[in-house]
Amino acid sequence: MISVPAAAEDFNPRKIYSETSRAVVLITGFEPGQRKMSKGTGSIISSDGFVLTNAHVIIDKNKGQPFNNLRIFLKPDRISGDLRKDTSLKYRAELVRFSENLDLALLRIRSPSISNLFPILEFSDSDLVSIGDPVIAIGHPEQGGLWTLTTGTISSHINNYGNIPGKNVFQTETS
């Protein structure tokens, strides 16, 4: 999930969701002929179709390698609750790079026609985030709906999480 920090006085979950949810994507990874599939959330971070996600979303745990087939689903104009309708905007994805240690993966949507059509989630300065700041998360919980919204607060900041240099994380009460 992607969490978007917001100043407390500007914290309007409905407005933030309306302005950013189209830059949130559903990602699936699978192997031909297998029923098991990985599912997770990603964020479009550039107008030419680069998507940031977690490495565990694109790794086949049985093989310890990235899935050969990666798909990205874009958010429809309106979420219906019907899986087929809500996942009709499907594109192939190319794995650009990943780090299992940092649990990050960079994908690229394989369709030039989507450039500049969707909002981009922009990065901001993480040094401006403080414990107690409100956040929202938009994503696809394992046993939940698609493009869901949850709110919470930053509860902790952890540097070098898991003793991995550079893996700095915020703990939130969002899910």
What are these regions (language model features)?
Residues 31-34, 51, 57-59, 100-102, ...:
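Solvent-exposed loop/turn segments at secondary-structure junctions
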Residues 23-28, 50-55, 128-141, 172-175:
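Active-site-proximal beta-strands of protease catalytic cores
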Residues 20-35, 110-120, 147-175:
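Active-site region of chymotrypsin-like
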Residues 4-55, 94, 102-105:
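N-terminal activation segment of mature serine protease catalytic domains
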Residues 16, 61, 94-96, 112-145:
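Active-site substrate-binding loop(s) of clan PA
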Residues 69, 82-94, 131-134, 147-159:
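Beta-strand/loop subdomains of soluble extracytoplasmic proteins
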Residues 16-20, 44-45, 85-87, 97-101, ...:
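Extracellular/periplasmic catalytic domains that process cell-envelope and extracellular macromolecules
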Residues 46-101, 111:
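Catalytic-histidine neighborhood of serine endopeptidases
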